[in-house]
């Protein structure tokens, strides 16, 4: 493995001003790809930016077993404001720009009032595994896919284990901290014996610049890729450090998720999401540990929290 120490670094403020914008070639000086082999990349400030492992999953039965399941997922989210720009054609809902610099809108309800919930452009992106308390769901829980599609979930778990092994081999200190953190969470909310609680599945979505909110601060993110068909773009850039990765099929990237990062636009040949019909697809799978899951109780106690929440909502509607 080759070590790279970058010689340029921008300010955090300048990187944050790019949030929601998509990456362009002007944003990077160094571009990593499969031809260059494995790379460990440090910033000019001495921090570890990423470790790039091209082809690390090629020929791995766990990768081959998980792909059909993840390809077949029809997860859709409108809670990805950082994915708004460049993906508006996924669904035109009359989005408007909000002061945060992200594309958000509020729907008009049937009674004519405006919803208080902000939404973004719908994209093929979603979460599987487990999730902590948040917003309207103040209880820890399995995602719907993990709870209902148990056989398919079982086909994904070996890939999570394989990626956990690559994390331990390549970022040992961070992997140890993250594994200890996850082991302290009830078993019901861990992805088997891996150092992860959650996976985000992005299907052919070009994320605008963003930091990953909610990931364990002392941990690391792990991303892997499945490419099918012909397309251009999808280069992942860390603009503060002016380095980018053009990842290919079976590649793995270990990265600091708290750095602002984002992708260049995607342009493919043939129907999107349908490589079996001569089209194209770019699956990126991101695994991490959710920091707020340290609060999770055993499932019975979390179900009690969920029931109390349901009763509160029912009472509120009854008095409305």
Where are these regions (language model features)?
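Ordered, helix-dominated protein-protein interaction surfaces in large eukaryotic regulatory proteins
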Residues: 226, 238, 252-255, 265, ...
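A short beta-strand-loop-beta hairpin characteristic of the jelly-roll/cupin
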Residues: 226-248
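Short Gly/Pro-enriched loop/turn and capping motifs at secondary-structure junctions
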Residues: 231, 260-262, 291-294
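Composition- and surface-driven signal marking solvent-exposed, interaction-prone regions
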Residues: 234-239, 265-268, 299-301
């Amino acid at each position: 493995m080759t070590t790279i120490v970058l010689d340029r670094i921008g300010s955090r403020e300048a990187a944050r001003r790019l949030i929601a914008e998509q990456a362009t070639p002007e944003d990077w000086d160094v571009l990593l790809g499969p031809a260059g082999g494995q790379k460990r990349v440090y910033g000019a400030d001495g921090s570890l930016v990423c470790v790039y492992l091209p082809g690390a999953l090629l020929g791995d039965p766990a990768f081959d077993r998980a792909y059909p399941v993840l390809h077949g997922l029809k997860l859709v989210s409108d809670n990805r404001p950082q994915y708004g720009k460049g993906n508006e054609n996924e669904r035109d809902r009359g989005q408007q720009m909000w002061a945060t610099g992200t594309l958000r809108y509020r729907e008009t309800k049937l009674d004519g009032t405006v919803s208080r919930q902000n939404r973004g452009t719908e994209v093929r992106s979603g979460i599987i595994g487990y999730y902590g308390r948040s917003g309207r769901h103040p209880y820890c829980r399995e995602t719907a896919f993990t709870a209902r599609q148990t056989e398919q979930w079982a086909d994904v778990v070996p890939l999570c284990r394989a990626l956990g092994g690559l994390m331990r081999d390549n970022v040992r200190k961070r992997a140890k901290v993250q594994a200890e953190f996850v082991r302290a969470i009830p078993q019901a909310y861990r992805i088997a014996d891996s150092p992860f609680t959650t996976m985000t599945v992005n299907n052919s979505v070009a994320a605008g610049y963003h930091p990953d909110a909610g990931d364990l601060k002392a941990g690391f993110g792990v991303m892997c890729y499945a490419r099918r068909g012909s397309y251009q773009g999808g280069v992942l850039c860390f603009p503060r450090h002016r380095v980018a990765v053009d990842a290919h099929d079976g590649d793995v990237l270990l990265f600091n998720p708290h750095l602002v990062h984002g992708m260049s636009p995607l342009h493919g040949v043939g129907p999107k999401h349908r490589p079996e019909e001569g089209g194209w697809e770019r699956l990126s799978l991101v695994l991490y540990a959710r920091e707020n899951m340290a609060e999770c109780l055993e499932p019975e106690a979390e179900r009690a929290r969920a029931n109390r929440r349901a009763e509160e909502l029912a009472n509120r509607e009854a008095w409305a």
